[in-house]
Amino acid sequence: WRMAHEYGKETLSKEFKSDRDKGLPDSELVEAVVALANTDGGCVYLGVEDDGTATGVQRKHQDPVGLSAMIANRTVPPISVRAQLVGDGVTVIQVDVPKSHSVVSTKSGRILRRMMKVDGTPESVPMYPYEIATRLSDLGKLDYSAQPVPGATREDFDPLERDRLRKIISTYRSSR
C-alpha cells in the first residue's frame, strides 16, 4: 500500500535527498538523520529533489528494514528511525526521524543540527562544542548550577546559606 504524496518544500523538519545517478551515499543520509534528530526530529524523503519533485530511489535503497538498520548502526547512540515506501508511481522512501533526547552523532563523530539560512531555506550544519551544552540544557539533561566554577573558593559562598544547607542535610539524614 502506497500513499500519494505532496512533497511541498524543505523545512527545518523535512529534508529531500536525491538518489539519482550514482545514488545518495549512505553517509549523507545518516548525516541528514543526525541533523534532524538533534533539532526537532522530522522526515527525510529519499528519492525527492530539492524542488520537491519525486525522481525515485535506487534498488539498493528500496528495503526500508535494511535502511533503518544501516542508520541505527551508523549513529551514536543508535537512532531508531521508521522507513517506509511511499510515492505514487515513483518509489520514494520516507524516513521518520524522532527528536533525540540526547546529542547524537554519526559513527565517524559528526554532530549536526538543522537551521534556517538567511534565504529561508533549511540546511544541516555542524553542532559545535559550546552548542552541545545549550542543547543538553534545553532538553533538561544539563544543570548549569552543577557545573564547576573555576577559581571559586569557600569564601565565595554566603556563610548563612552554608549554615542553612548544613541544617537541610542534617534534617534529611535524621529522617532516613
Please give the residue ranges for each predicted region.
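Conserved N-terminal catalytic/coupling substructures associated with nucleotide/phosphate chemistry
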Residues: 1-176
